[in-house]
From Swiss-Prot:
Binding site for Zn(2+): 174, 177, 198, 201
GO biological process, one term: protein targeting to vacuole
Organism whose genome encodes this protein: Phaeosphaeria nodorum (strain SN15 / ATCC MYA-4574 / FGSC 10173)
Family: Belongs to the VPS27 family.
Protein name: Vacuolar protein sorting-associated protein 27
Lineage of producing organism: Eukaryota, Fungi, Dikarya, Ascomycota, Pezizomycotina
């Protein structure tokens, strides 16, 4: 830009400054013209500052005052680049030197006051700007030295904001069509945005009055479109008078879209109107047709005017029908308007019933006054005493707010009543929710009780476990084996297969080998002993030498459908020994006697139902049994564990064992535990030694409770 200016330009600018700062009256248009020249960067800002500084040092006070006014005008309209030159040390130190000059060469008092006024106003407007900080330094230094400034005026910082031509940017390609610059394709800068473009994209010229440029200057196509749209207020189609060698997609995308959208919308609208007119003209029977339209229609080539006569005959009827329909439409419109007016009137009449609360509610203005008063009071707490007396606005606010006390008190009372109502409603809602939860719990408990009664659970407060089979509550017999770990009844995995030996338990009756298959079976069914899952194998634990007589292939697990309470699991201490076929048979059917004949299967199932009437306290001798006898496996009906709580009947005298086999009393207490811990799902434990797993036996059938026969006494059981 420096190539634009020369000595001729500076001399012309100096002449303009001399004419503007002559001793005559102030020429405001000339001052604005000079500021536009500075803002348009026609003259360098440093040269303009030097010219003004030279003119301020004139001996004539009128010239000095006019120069100071011109400087203020240029500061407010010359742009940021000129303000930085005014805020430089060269210009500000010149002003301070004139203020501090001796009385012989000191300027007039009016000139001094004008300088102080301008310095104060410039410093106020330059607060917060780092590049103009030297003005504030000069202002504070003059205050410390005791110079009396005029009353301070609040001047916004936007006073120094003025539009100026932007700084020029550089690029290797056109910033519009992206064409590379070459020796023939030269760079051109847009005076509006400062970007660089090729000659094809920056061929427009337009004056820029908002930047102080009154003569037409080069701008690019995008800025030209923006400025012309802004000036005319309507979209202008883009002229194509200049040939553009490189037309690219980017260049086309920069074109304004508003003109294209408007043209397409107008074309669509015109086409729609034409189609509607064609449809209206084509339907001759839809309404009255004028004679001009009938004459303009071409006559059909066939049949002459054979179809025209009936149309002319039907025209009066059609006209009458159309008139009747129009009359009906008018009546409907009138009815609609009347009903609509009535509705609006009723709504407007009902509207005042909603607004009685406005009498005591605070208006936004009153609320704002209250907030303002509170803010002022908070600020006055940090002020010296007596400040409140010098502020009449605070007194006026206090008087106006004092009148609002009754309204504020009433509003506060209404708010408190609403708060109490809200608390009451919340309490009611919480009580209702609590009652509802209680009702749900009662329904759930009743549902669980019904389910327990269906499966034969005697305890109404016991909640059934999430298992497939119902639990059996029975009095556990005394004299059972201790737990291996705790000495108590086993609580984990109560359905594992009992092993051959026990730690701390009672020994075998005579430590004899098991009986041969020729001996008699026990006559009690296994379902009568739910509290002792495996009486035959658990009570007779002969040495390992006795187990060698039996077959090693019959180590089996219990039937999957038998469910036993968790207290009757017998952990093994010694490695499991082999069990004979008779043992496995008695494992399912039980053998409590030594010499009794086996009871038929049907008698077992019947006598099982008759056991509640014959329940007696258990004794330790009932767990000492003879070796089992070979017995075929029975159907799963004999193994049904879903009966109610059963207890072992008193054994006959044949079951009496020697006294050395009686267990100590703590073992009897271990078996007499609450029945609530017996509701655990059956989970068969795997055998430690190889044998038959759960898959070797039938799966658990979903058996219903068989009907119990009341007061059925099995005579052979009583005799024995």
């Amino acid at each position: 830009m420096a190539g634009w200016f020369g000595s001729s330009t500076n001399s012309a600018f100096d002449e303009q400054i001399e004419r503007a700062t002559s001793s005559s009256l102030e020429d405001m248009p000339l001052n604005l013209e000079i500021s536009d020249v500075i803002r348009s960067k026609t003259v360098q800002p440093k040269d303009a500052m030097k010219s003004l500084k030279k003119r301020i040092g004139h001996k004539n006070p009128n010239v000095q005052l006019a120069t100071l006014n011109l400087t203020d005008t240029c500061v407010k309209n010359g742009g940021a680049h000129f303000i930085q030159e005014i805020a430089s040390r060269e210009f500000m130190d010149n002003l301070t030197s004139l203020l501090k000059a001796p009385s012989t060469i000191a300027p007039n008092n009016d000139v001094k006051n004008k300088m102080l006024e301008l310095i104060q106003s410039w410093a106020t407007a330059a607060e917060g700007r780092m590049n103009l900080g030297y003005i504030n330094e000069v202002y504070r230094s003059l205050q410390r030295e005791g110079y009396h400034f005029p009353p301070k005026e609040n001047i916004a910082s936007s006073m120094l904001d003025s539009s100026a031509p932007p700084e020029w940017t550089d690029s290797d390609v056109c910033m519009r069509c992206r064409t590379a610059f070459t020796f023939t394709n030269r760079k051109h800068h847009c005076r509006n945005c400062g970007n660089v473009f090729c000659g094809a994209c920056s061929s427009k010229t337009i004056p820029l009055p908002h930047l102080g440029i009154m003569e037409p200057v080069r701008v690019d196509d995008g800025c030209h479109e923006k400025l012309t749209i802004r000036s005319r207020g309507a979209p202008v189609p883009r002229p194509f008078d200049t040939p553009k060698p490189h037309k690219t997609l980017y260049q086309g995308a920069m074109e304004p879209r508003s003109a294209r959208v408007d043209d397409s919308f107008d074309a669509d609208l015109k086409r729609a109107l034409e189609m509607s007119l064609e449809d209206a003209k084509g339907t001759g029977s839809s309404g009255f047709v004028s004679q001009s339209q009938l004459q303009s229609k071409p006559k059909p080539s066939t049949n002459g005017s054979s179809r025209k006569e009936p149309q002319e005959e039907e025209d009066p009827d059609l006209a009458a029908a159309i008139a009747a329909s129009l009359a009906d439409m008018e009546e409907q419109k009138k009815k609609y308007t009347t009903t609509f007016k009535q509705q609006t009137a009723s709504s407007s009449a009902a509207a005042p019933f909603v607004a009685p609360k406005n009498d005591y509610e605070l208006t936004p203005v009153e609320a704002e006054n209250i907030n303002l008063f509170s803010t002022l009071v908070d600020r006055l707490q940090h002020q010296p005493p007596g400040t409140i007396l010098r502020e009449p606005q605070i007194q006026e606010l206090y008087e106006s707010i004092g009148k609002l006390r009754p309204k504020l008190a009433r509003t506060y009372g209404e708010t408190m009543s609403k708060h109490d109502t809200l608390l009451d409603l919340h309490a009611k809602l919480s009580s209702v929710v609590r009652y509802y939860d209680r009702m749900l719990e009662e329904r759930l408990s009743s549902t669980y009780n019904q389910a327990g009664a269906m499966y034969g659970l005697p305890a109404p407060t016991q909640r059934p476990a999430s298992n497939l089979y119902p639990s059996i509550q029975s009095g556990a017999p005394s004299g059972a084996g201790e737990n291996y770990y705790t000495g108590n009844a086993s609580q984990s995995d109560p359905y594992g297969r009992p092993q051959s030996h026990y730690a701390g338990g009672y020994q075998s009756t005579s430590q004899q080998p098991y009986r041969t298959p020729g001996q008699s079976q026990e006559q009690y069914p296994p379902a009568q002993q739910p509290s002792q899952p495996y009486p035959n194998l658990s009570q007779q634990a002969p040495p390992s030498s006795n187990y060698q007589q039996s077959s090693p292939q019959l180590q089996r697990q219990e039937a999957p459908n038998q469910q036993y309470p968790p207290q009757q699991a017998y952990p093994s201490q010694a490695p499991p020994s082999t069990v004979s076929d008779a043992e496995s048979a008695n494992y399912y059917y039980g053998d409590n006697t030594q010499g009794q004949p086996s009871q038929p299967p049907m008698q077992r199932s019947q006598s099982f139902a008759s056991q509640p009437a014959q329940q007696q306290p258990p004794s330790p001798q009932m767990y000492n049994h003879a070796p089992p006898q070979q017995t075929p496996l029975s159907p799963p009906a004999y193994q049904n564990p879903s009966y109610p709580s059963q207890q072992q009947t008193a054994p006959p005298p044949q079951q009496q064992a020697p006294p050395q086999q009686a267990p100590p009393p703590p073992q009897q207490q271990q078996w007499q535990q609450p029945a609530q811990t017996q509701t655990q799902a059956w989970q068969p434990a795997p055998y430690a030694a190889g044998g038959y797993g759960p898959e070797s036996f039938p799966s658990a059938p979903q058996n219903q409770l068989p009907p119990q026969q009341q007061k059925v006494v099995d005579e052979p059981l009583i005799d024995l």
